[in-house]
Amino acid sequence: KDKIMIYGAMLAGGVGSRMKSAVIPKQFLEVEGKPIIIYTLQNMLKVDRFDYIYIATHKDYLAYMKEMVQKYTDKPEKVRIIEGGKERMDSIHNVTDAILKDEGVHEDDVIVIHDAVRPLVTEKILNDSIDAAGTYGACVCGLPAVDTMLYSEDGKVVTTIPERSKLFNG
């Protein structure tokens, strides 16, 4: 294969266990009549540079995710839905395995990994990430931290308060 491939990977394998009140995983909660994950997907689909977007979702929601892609997107052929893993890293592993199986891999190919419950991602952030990964081999997005962070060795006593200007939310 001669063409450098660019893949989007949306991680949606969680079941929202930290959201005790949720009946369904938070990525499927609706805002203005649409699941959050669909807003994220629609923003990723605006980036024409993505050859495919893989969505790693919980096995119990594979069929539902396929329905949502058909219902809400105009490019369902660019979306591939796979089973997510137990943990975030397992889902990333499943995506990379699926890409390897489906497409093969070239060392210059790019995979942009994004959390499905972060729907406000912009085309600029995604395109800048693709460019940075192409230039440097890898990149991670981050925003300057606005909250004061506390560090504790034992989880009980604050050891230090890191300088906020050196901290970023990833």
Question: In which residue ranges do the predicted regions lie?
Answer:
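N-terminal glycine-rich phosphate-binding loop and ensuing alpha1 helix
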Residues: 4-62
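Residue-level signal for inorganic ion chemistry
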Residues: 10, 37, 95, 114-115, ...
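Hydrophobic C-terminal alpha-helix "anchor/cap" residues
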Residues: 41-45, 69, 99
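Residues at the starts of beta-strands that form the adenosine-phosphate
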Residues: 51-53, 78, 137-138
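Acidic helix N-cap motif at the loop->helix transition within catalytic regions
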Residues: 63-68
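Short phosphate-binding loop-to-helix
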Residues: 70-107
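Short beta-strand-to-loop acidic/aromatic patch adjacent to the donor-nucleotide binding site
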Residues: 105-117
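Conserved core of the sugar-phosphate nucleotidyltransferase
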Residues: 107, 120-170
